């Protein structure tokens, strides 16, 4: 079991924040409020941002900030306990208590809100409400036109209902409960059938929900579609066929060449580019190890990359790769290092 710590391995730039309050938000869901020890202002963040939480064993987990970005004296995250996950959510639920100090990273945003759109469509599945809730707060402050569709198994499984109630009363937030059968819930395909110029779409949730959203918005312009996956979700690579990011069958060995020195290193099928670089003294910052956060992104100069991240746009993939999950379709990749 992984144990959060303020004395373990984490960057020197991490923030030591105190847990001021923990609130129950639904079945298996707790919200955690972090503040500075001196009660001062925290670094500002934008809607859709996340922070890293650091564990004793060096592992890192990302959690979306879900409070109003205008608030400067607290960070709020919500954590769904997953007994079949990698241990992070269990550690937080069982070991993080009020008044404890926790190492928290600075806010980063890979899922930004595009402001100024004539209409914003937000789709949340389960705990995927977290980044979208922050967007709702921002859109409310702007007086922007938006609709949030929040899908959950039941009311008991939906977080932040009391806080979202005023928006629901105005018809801005619409709840959809399917009893555990998505076929009885929101018809995502029907909802996304309509697109108007300038509209922006955002979605976040579990794998099946994400797949349904992705398949339903293929006619939307790429620049109008924004999404954020969780760890363990299936990825749609270049050919559109779902894969498992960690598939050994597809993790073929290849070589990487360091452009600045000409050094050639072999990446075996059981190691990532980031791991091999680290073993040879070439440190590339890493965080999620799952192609979610972009911390380990580097530029490549030559080679045919098999991208397995959830983050990079088609344009970005022509220049960058994520060293934690990307592989090579050919014999060699040349990295701009």
UniProtKB/Swiss-Prot annotation:
Known EC number: 1.-.-.-
Sorted UniProt keywords: 2Fe-2S, Electron transport, Flavoprotein, Iron, Iron-sulfur, Metal-binding, Oxidoreductase, Transport
Cysteine-cysteine disulfides: none
Induction: Induced in the presence of tert-butyl alcohol (TBA).
Listed InterPro entries: 2Fe-2S_ferredoxin-like_sf, 2Fe-2S_ferredoxin-type, 2Fe2S_fd_BS, Beta-grasp_dom_sf, FAD-bd_FR_type, FNR_nucleotide-bd, MRET, OxRdtase_FAD/NAD-bd
Function statement: Reductase component of a two-component system involved in the degradation of tertiary alcohols such as tert-butyl alcohol (TBA) and tert-amyl alcohol (TAA). MdpK probably provides electrons via its [2Fe-2S] iron-sulfur cluster to the MdpJ oxygenase subunit.
Name by which UniProt lists this protein: Tert-butanol monooxygenase / tert-amyl alcohol desaturase reductase subunit
Species of provenance: Aquincola tertiaricarbonis
